[in-house]
Amino acid sequence: EFECEFLGSVDTLISVSKLKTLVYNDPIKRNAGLDIYENPKEDHNYIITVDTARGIDGDYSAFIVFDITNFPYRVVAKYKNNEIKPMLFPSIIHDIAKAYNYAYTLIEVNDIGDQVASILFFDLEYENVLMCAMRGRAGQIVGSGFSGKKSQLGVRMTSAVKKLGCSNLKTLLEDDKLMTVDYDIIAELTTFVQRKNTFMAEEGCHDDLAMCLVIFALSLIHLLPFRPPPL
């Protein structure tokens, strides 16, 4: 465990006082962008949230694996790669999701993520891809197995949806309901700031992992009441 004082910028989503308390550990396994902190455990419940990039050396395609069996929820693995092509990314998600007890996956589908979600669900036949049902002014409801035309694979990140996710993420982290010891995640949180009436990375920084956290916070709003208890 390494104590490193992460000093947040001005207007970070997470308070500077909280950021100062975060410490990081080395992963137990590291391979081609995948860092593992805890191996899969029998009877544990996991969810994976995914943020996809185009794979041309700009932003990173990223996902985070969360253990949601008990409070506090924990980051148990993360993947971050700025060269992986969108056509290949679903296979990596598929392998890790299966390993973590067929984890539910929630994919942000504003851009190329739509293709990733489709390949994972239709081509790789992975059934635990979460969907969103459109509910008019209520926005998007996250869940599985919706029927009807107004449902889609993954979550579409509108400004209202992102605002809700950011608010919930702030509560989770500052109330110690979500724990992470990943250096890259903590580093991104220190530069995830308010800009143009939303939260995003500071100029020259990345927020791919931070957005995976936001997607996770969104999923909890809808999913947890329906989550089956551990066997």
Give, region by region, the residue ranges found by the protein language model.
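RNase H-like, metal-dependent nuclease domains and their acidic two-metal-ion catalytic environment used
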Residues: 1-134, 144, 159, 163, ...
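Surface-exposed loop and turn segments in beta-propeller and other repeat-based domains
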Residues: 137-138
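Surface-exposed intrinsically disordered loops and tails
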Residues: 143-153
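Amphipathic alpha-helical blocks and their helix-capping loop/short-beta junctions
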Residues: 153-159
